[in-house]
Swiss-Prot record:
Protein name per Swiss-Prot or TrEMBL: T-cell receptor gamma chain C region DFL12
Record region (C region): 1-136
Domain of life: Eukaryota
Transmembrane segments: 137-157
InterPro entries linked: Ig-like_dom, Ig-like_dom_sf, Ig-like_fold, Ig_C1-set, TRG_var/const_region
GO cellular component: external side of plasma membrane
The keyword Membrane is assigned to this record: yes
Subcellular location: Membrane
Length: 169
């Protein structure tokens, strides 16, 4: 349509999400998510492969949705525990890809990411505890500051009202 500028970048913009630690520990699977946004026109093809493989993997995708004159689509790949050590790629075919080539979005091995980030499962709990503690500490400090503000404001207002009353007498 005529509402699209010719110089505008209307190729798919990817946002990726890796499987959560909770999902991999609880369900022994991992879901990789690729969200493609701000592309035009709406004709797009998304599929998944292993990093060095040519076989198209079984994946799912949502409907193409219109958002503010452009489109968005999401696709996800759920891999079993035995495939979590592999790297994967999401391949996007769209007529406005830069250079006219397929866009390949690489996803690292979840086992590699998990072992790099967390040496021990207790590290995750420790991080959660630290985050929660920091949250409540900052909340307490904010509350303390508000109380001090109220006390100082009350004292200053009372002082000015006392000063003003003495001058009138």
């Amino acid at each position: 349509p005529s509402d699209k500028r010719l110089d505008a970048d209307i190729s798919p913009k990817p946002t990726i999400f890796l499987p959560s630690v909770a999902e991999t520990n609880l369900h022994k699977t991992g879901t990789y998510l690729c969200i493609l946004e701000k592309f035009f026109p709406d004709v797009i093809r998304v599929y998944w492969k292993d990093k060095n493989g040519n076989t198209i993997l079984d994946s799912q995708e949502g409907d193409t949705l219109k958002t503010k004159g452009t489109y968005m689509k999401f696709s996800w790949l759920t891999v079993p525990e035995r495939s979590m050590g592999k790297e994967h790629r999401c391949i996007v075919k769209h007529e406005n890809n830069k250079g006219g080539a397929d866009q390949e979005i690489f996803f690292p091995s979840i086992k590699k990411v998990a072992t790099t980030c967390w040496q021990d499962k207790n590290d995750v709990l420790q991080l959660q505890f630290m985050s929660t503690s920091a949250y409540y500490t900052y909340l307490l400090l904010l509350l303390k500051s508000v109380i001090y503000l109220a006390i100082i404001s009350f004292s200053l207002l009372r002082r000015t009202s006392v000063c003003c009353n003495e001058k009138r007498s």
